[in-house]
Curated annotation (Swiss-Prot):
Residues 68-253 form the Reticulon domain. Its main location: endoplasmic reticulum. The lineage of its organism: Eukaryota, Viridiplantae, Streptophyta, Embryophyta, Tracheophyta. The chain crosses the membrane at residues 78-98, 99-119, 173-193. The gene is RTNLB6. It holds the Pfam family Reticulon. One of its GO terms (biological process) is response to bacterium. InterPro entries: Reticulon (IPR003388), Reticulon-like (IPR045064). Residues 23-40 have a biased composition (Basic and acidic residues). The modification N-acetylalanine is found at A2. This is Reticulon-like protein B6. It comes from Arabidopsis thaliana. Keywords: Acetylation, Cell membrane, Endoplasmic reticulum, Membrane, Transmembrane, Transmembrane helix.
Length: 253
């Protein structure tokens, strides 16, 4: 009788343990499901958003950071407005007033030298110490740094042009030809100085506006690029793939 009582108690304990295990498993599974269904953080969602040209850095970093990026993005409004104002004054002076660059440089030098000459003689006449004119010289290391950076950019451009001329990349060839054609068309509308001024104004407006509205611009840009890729694939299939260059490249590949 005692043994049967012990067996029944043992069965009840094992049954209670099974029920407790099932409850525990259900709680753990529900908690894991809730973790999976938990919405991602805003930073993670923002990281997955498409950015224009596939960039992963902020606009400030893309522009190189430092003072130039601060000027283009209007971090310091007074400095940015001053730079844009000086550029506008130069453009008005040369284009609208039709002042010549060589004449401007000569007149500025004449005015500066005359003012310093008269000031130095006036101080000597009044027995005062003449004004200190600082020595101006370009450091060799800075000059070599600029020349080296320019040389690297030119060499990289020559490598790209050579690879295009050898017919290795038809897509790049068409893009470069189209870009040069666009530049030639724009060059017929404006002279060089006006074109430089327009680019300068664009650099002072477009990055700043894009940084403010990038969350609205990027989805539109993503859709546009997808449509362009679709059209390019159709063009590649119907036209480019039938060209002798493309077939020769496929055979060599």
């Amino acid at each position: 009788m005692a043994e049967e009582l012990e067996k029944s108690m043992h069965k009840e304990e094992s049954l209670m343990e099974k029920i407790a295990d099932k409850i525990h498993d259900h709680d753990s599974s529900s908690s894991s499901d809730s973790e999976h269904e938990k919405p991602e953080s805003p930073s993670a969602l923002k990281a997955k958003i498409y950015r224009l040209f596939g960039r992963e850095k902020p606009v400030h970093k893309v522009l190189g950071g430092g003072l130039p990026a601060d000027v283009f993005l209007w971090r310091d409004k007074k400095l940015s407005a001053s730079v844009l104002g000086v550029a506008t004054a130069i453009w008005v002076l040369f284009e609208l007033v039709e002042y010549h660059f060589l004449s401007l440089v000569c007149h500025i030098l004449i005015f500066a030298l005359a003012a310093l000459f008269l000031l130095s003689n006036a101080h000597a006449f009044m027995n005062k110490t003449p004004p200190k004119i600082p020595e101006i010289h370009i450091k060799e290391e800075h000059f070599l740094m600029i020349v080296s950076a320019l040389r690297n950019e030119l060499n990289q451009a020559f490598v790209i042009l050579r690879s295009i001329a050898l017919g290795r990349d038809l897509k790049k060839f068409l893009m470069v030809v189209f870009g040069l054609w666009i530049i030639s068309v724009v060059g017929n509308w404006f002279n060089f100085l006006t074109l430089v001024y327009i680019c300068f104004v664009v650099l002072h407006t477009v990055p700043m506006l894009y940084e403010k509205h990038e969350d609205k611009v990027d989805p539109v840009a993503e859709k546009t690029l997808k449509e362009l890729k679709k059209h390019y694939m159709v063009f590649d299939e119907k036209v480019l793939s039938k060209l002798p260059v493309a077939s020769l490249k496929a055979k060599l590949g």
